[in-house]
Design a protein with these regions (language model features):
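C-terminal and inter-domain tail/linker signature
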Residues: 1-164
Length: 164
């Protein structure tokens, strides 16, 4: 019965969304706007999770996992470590755009000042690639950095400004 009701609900939702003119491209545009709103403040407040599938796959140079619960945990961990280890940290979002029919790309820079007496600065650029399913929800998020994790870690021991 539950499966049958879920199927009816999905069918109803599809017709309802079609009826009000919400199509795939509109959904992608909404996802782009959500990302644009979420990323600049990801070190300060939580992001919106309604644009991701339950089995979202995430990968960056140091992490790889699947599932929305784990995805939530990684963002909580980012905020926790940002408050604990940095006196100042920023996520500068440069651009978010649809790079293919089912792909969204975001370019960004992370920069901050470590909570250490020598006030080490960190700085690295990267881009996020989001893949969307047929419903316009993100099922894969991969981050690519312009430096290896070890190179970023070395910035922690330098005094003052990070080298670009």
């Amino acid at each position: 019965i539950i499966f049958y009701l879920a199927k009816i609900n999905k069918t109803f939702s599809h017709y309802f969304l079609e009826g009000i003119g919400v199509d795939y491209q509109t959904q992608i545009n909404q996802v782009i706007e959500t990302i644009k709103g979420d990323l600049p403040t990801l070190f300060e407040k939580d992001i919106s999770y309604n644009i991701y599938t339950q089995d979202i796959y995430f990968q960056d140079p140091v992490n790889k996992f699947k599932g929305k619960v784990n995805y939530r945990i990684i963002f909580w961990t980012l905020r926790f470590h940002a408050r604990l280890f940095f006196t100042e940290i920023h996520f500068d979002l440069h651009d978010v755009y649809q790079s293919a029919e089912d792909i969204i790309t975001a370019t960004w820079t992370v920069r901050g000042v470590l909570r250490v007496p020598w006030q080490a600065h960190i700085f690295f650029n990267g881009y996020s690639t989001y893949k969307l399913n047929q419903d316009g929800l993100i099922y894969e998020h991969k981050d690519t950095w312009d430096r290896k994790p070890g190179e970023i870690l070395q910035q922690f021991f330098r005094k003052g400004k990070a080298h670009n």
